[in-house]
Amino acid sequence: ITNVYRLLAYAALERQPAQYRAAADFLIQLRDQSRESQDFAEVNRLIGDCYFLNRDFANAVDFYSAALSRGVGSPRDGELFLRLISAQVRAGLIEQASQLIDQADSSGSISQADRWRAEWNVAQALQASGELDLALQRVRLLLRDDSPSTVPASLDIRLRWLESYLSLQAEELDGLANRVALLLARLVTMPPQQEGAGDALTPKEARLLKTEILLLQGSVYMREGDANAGMGVLTQLRDEYGETTAALRSYLIEAAYHGLIGDFVSAQATMTKLAEIYPQNPLAPQALFEAALYCERRGAEFYPQAVVLYNDLATQYATDPLFYYARLKQGNLLRSMNNFAGAQIVYENLINGFPAHEMRYIAELSRADCMLALAGNDFDGLADVAVILERLLDLPNLPLDFQAEAAQKWAFALIKRGSIEKAKEVLWLSADRFIGDGEKAVALGAAGRYWLARSMLQLGEIFEEQDNLAEARKVYRQVIAYNLPGRHIAISRVDQILVLE
């Protein structure tokens, strides 16, 4: 029977694409037939591999843990330990991975080199999750260990590069430029890899590390304000290793520096150059997008140029995820330039072309803004706007802030076409939706609170115009009680009502 399960698992893995989950199920059946502890541990490792390859990292953790606990002392413990750490990190169990490393180090159950490799994974995961200080702390603790090192020189260089990189991210620049320079010099003077030398770097590894260290060195100089030295290093990187990802990312570093000092012209030019040099790279659309953002920051007179950049992105990279956002930005700029008709076309194309897009509600609301601006006092045009905004509020999962904004604009369109009672109903329902539900009121962001305040002040005005001062006062007092924007206006209106009464 065990041979049957082996064959079934093998067949599942040989399929195209591989059926990792099915293979794991067959291996579980095989494991349950096992009597030997070592066989049990090995099959658990294989099951963990299947789940890992299926990106089910939580289950991979369980089976790797079981394999490690039953296979203590095997020559594959170090490899299995690293797989477990990698699965924990990918499953978001960073604290658990850190504790496992500390326990294994204290008990001496892993080699020094394996501990360093595990710390590499954990430190990068900590940084990605926003725990930069903790990542830096763990790496520095590792590097300060004075015990005799059995770590390969190549791994030591990688960890020291990581420490320097994290230091830059943490803005801890003291002595950093010198550390990076020494690291680069050490790498350059390392002898070439010889057969059987475990700690040597392959030419490919050495090249990759050198480009990353050069990029880091240029970044450090730029961050310190030494733009000439920084650009010198980045230029060297581009000249000598122009085809590498580090050379490409050097343009991002340069643009960020220009943006930081307010030189948006140079920042825009740098991002545009990146897109021109590497048009097939996945970063090219991002470069055009950022170039347009920098162009916007130059001032309103450059909005037409930014529109062209967003259009270039959308035209050249129609399948890129940034396409939708580039078109949204293009429409927003056209609105800022009072080209509401052009903006409306952009939004309508997005709505029709991407009916299920998660950001559709933004295009819908923006289109309604354009139609509202173009309608003026046209009765039919305002009616169309009201219908669109009413439908918008029926969209599932519409963020609360947008609910508040859409309701206020719907009521505004109704008021402009003379439908006061309907507008009052819309405003009242909007106020009740948020004020009547404490959780929703607290969940509103700054924009949502602004639109809710406008709705309530508008509702109060309608009540005043209808001589319903008691209801108007009640609405204004709710604005005051919830400390909404326009609170002082509400206080003034309450005082005026008291005088009239």
Spell out what each predicted region is.
Residues 1-501:
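Acidic, polar-rich low-complexity tracts and alpha-helical solenoid repeat scaffolds
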